[in-house]
A protein has these predicted regions:
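Basic/aromatic recognition patch in beta-strand/loop cores that engages polyanionic ligands
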Residues: 51-83
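Residue-level signal for beta-strand positions within conserved beta-sheet cores that form or flank
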Residues: 1, 65, 85-88
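Hydrophobic recognition helices of helix-based DNA-binding modules
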Residues: 18, 22, 43-46, 50
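Residue-level recognition of specific faces of alpha-helices
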Residues: 14, 38, 42-45, 68
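Juxtamembrane/interface motifs at transmembrane-helix termini
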Residues: 34-35, 52-55, 109-110
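Charged, solvent-exposed alpha-helical segments that act as regulatory interaction surfaces
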Residues: 24, 28, 48, 52-55
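Arg/Lys-rich, positively charged N-terminal/basic patches that mediate binding to nucleic acids
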Residues: 1-38
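Enriched for short, Lys/Arg-rich terminal
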Residues: 71-75, 79-110
């Protein structure tokens, strides 16, 4: 059964920041289109096969199972709500961002 998805407020803000950066700093509408297409394809895959992406382990998030998917140079972090058949998109980060620092400051409940 296919899952639905929902973005947290943090994930929406992260996505806005990514798109703004791609559009204004790279001045490339092609980069924006490519990112959005990769995001769409990744979301389709996650909704069909939610457990297929890598489960991450980090000392700062041991209370929830979080998976990650790479989209260009960004990482999409999500959790699975199996009861409600929902994918929760938690955050996005740049692939070169320090994961420990990111998870230490990340509030996954918002």
């Amino acid at each position: 059964m296919e899952y639905k998805y929902q973005f947290t407020a943090h994930a929406e803000k992260d996505l806005d920041n990514i798109l703004s950066y791609l559009e204004h700093n790279l001045t490339s509408y092609t980069a924006v289109r490519n990112f959005l297409e990769e995001l769409r394809l990744t979301m389709e895959n996650i909704c069909l096969f939610p457990n297929s992406y890598k489960l991450i382990q980090n000392k700062y998030i041991n209370n929830i199972a979080i998976r990650k998917a790479l989209i260009m140079q960004y990482i999409l972090y999500y959790s699975i709500d199996s009861i409600n058949k929902k994918i929760i998109i938690i955050r996005f980060s740049h692939s070169e961002q320090d994961a420990d620092k990111f998870f230490k400051t990340m509030n996954i409940n918002q």
